Amino acid sequence: MDKNEALRTFTTGENFHLQHYLGAHQDEVDGKSGYSFRVWAPNAQSVHLIGDFTNWYEEQIPMVRNEAGVWEVFTELPKEGDIYKYNIKRSSGQEILKIDPLAIYLEERPGTGAVIRTISEKKWKDGLWLARRKRWGFFSRPVNIYEVHAGSWKRNEDGSPYSFAQLKEDLIPYLVEMNYTHVEFMPLMAHPLGLSWGYQLMGYFAFEHTYGTPEEFQDFVEECHLNNIGVIVDWVPGHFTINDDALAYYDGTPTFEYQDHDRAHNYGWGALNFDLGKNQVQSFLISSIKFWIDFYHLDGIRVDAVSNMLYLDYDSGPWQPNKDGGNRNYEGYYFLQRLNTVIKLAHPDVMMIAEESSSETKITGMRELGGLGFDYKWNMGWMNDILRFYEEDPIYRKYDFNLVTFSFMYAFSENFLLPFSHDEVVHGKKSLMHKMWGDRYNQFAGLRNLLTYQICHPGKKLLFMGSEFGQFLEWKSEEQLEWSNLDDQMNKKMQGFTAALNAFYKDNRPLWEIDLSYDGIEIIDADNTDQSVLSFIRKTEKGDMLVCVFNMAPVERKNFTIGVPVEAIYEEVWNTELEEWGGVWKEHNETVQSQEGLWKDYPQTLTFTLPALGASIWKIKRRIARKNVKKDSTKE
């Protein structure tokens, strides 16, 4: 794309490779080698390029404005490694130094200058992974995500976070050992505070230097792919940091943010909202995420705070209704549709995941039918209900059993992902293990039950770091996980349990092959509120099945009976109360032959002992006969 076409498509919102036009680029003009700099500041009175190569303010280089508000200059002065900024003169006459919004490298904190560095093209070795990803997709594949804050998974002795070179050596073997299919990172784009979570960004193309270099992250992703692990990154297209030296009021007027003051300001988060209806902002944001997908070979993007982009009144501050008198943010809705259209045309095999907390419908609906076109939506309703239930004293659970069963009413209204994320283990909410009811033994039993329920429930899975071994204290972003917990045998066994559970999930197609329709699940009994027991079947297209039974009460139930559709010998393949995982059972239930007898609509019954606060999963070891099979429950 030549310069004129790049400028035209930028102004029409159709330039999705903006990093090749704006920013700093090696160039040659009239036989002279140097760098061309371009920045969008349409209402600036003047823009000067300053940096190491100008002795900063001493020899500022004036830039020239074109008709679209892009300022440009070519100079031979810069060299590799030099730091630069733009000195922007506003209409008020005030001058302010600003970052380059398209910078791929930023200097180390506390500075915010862009660094001139040549981007070397990596010779990737993950071709087989990418080919498999394209061929297999992800809807009918196992997706079990380990959510990580890169700055606090592990830290060095001096308290500094691990770089991605170190995470490559430590985290990837851990992911393999724990049998996860994907790892998801909280934002890795440049943000003002190194100890923050990263959700108020300043550099949408720049890698957060706290975690090393872009090249180190490329190597990390490649090594993940070579170990059959996908990589997902959080991205924040709705709002950005209010810091003066970043994008805020870039040229002295609303540039990236909305013109209206209240729409521009996100009062609850102390941030600014992108003007998602502005063509140039659309080019900027979509180029950002395409760059991350292409440059780092990412397998998925989790779009943060989607509700904030869909509703004008989502924030706590004042707001104005739309042209129809409602609270729908039409610009945000159309932007998200367009975002997913562009990404899916280029990368149909890259997951687009919405973190969306409202009751808005069609988040994962087809764009052609008015949906937003995401592949998955976080099921926040399921997460809130299920955590409330597992925190409750079992005495009262029979009165709130609908908290467990209600999700089956809407489980396929969207393509759901079931999250136990970082948001649930901070700010006084307690860790996942600490949320569980009872003494220490029962808390671990409850956590084993909970994680098994998550694995068996339709939908893809996500678990925040530390929860896999039952960390007791809340997550603290400025400290590493409590790895010392693993000196305690209960935590060590919990870690082993999670690794085995993740392997069990990957190895059993009924748990993931049909995650998007009722064809993949059959409820046996959701009405046993008095005993707080839930049972259902997960199935494959070929009719293979797992019988999943959950006892949410601390009472062992001997001679417990449920109905099953097939006459067969059944074997227990999962029991959360085995000694090796911190329970009291020395071994599995013995194999059981089903018995003829009508149980609800089922022609056969299965009787066994159900562990206290335990989950028991059964599969057919050998079919005996195919008589009186419940219609549609299995296929020939």
From Swiss-Prot:
It comes from Streptococcus sanguinis (strain SK36). GO terms for biological process: glycogen biosynthetic process. The keyword Transferase applies. This is 1,4-alpha-glucan branching enzyme GlgB. Its EC number is 2.4.1.18. Monomer. Pfam families: Alpha-amylase (PF00128), Alpha-amylase_C (PF02806), CBM_48 (PF02922). GO terms for molecular function: 1,4-alpha-glucan branching enzyme activity; cation binding; hydrolase activity, hydrolyzing O-glycosyl compounds.
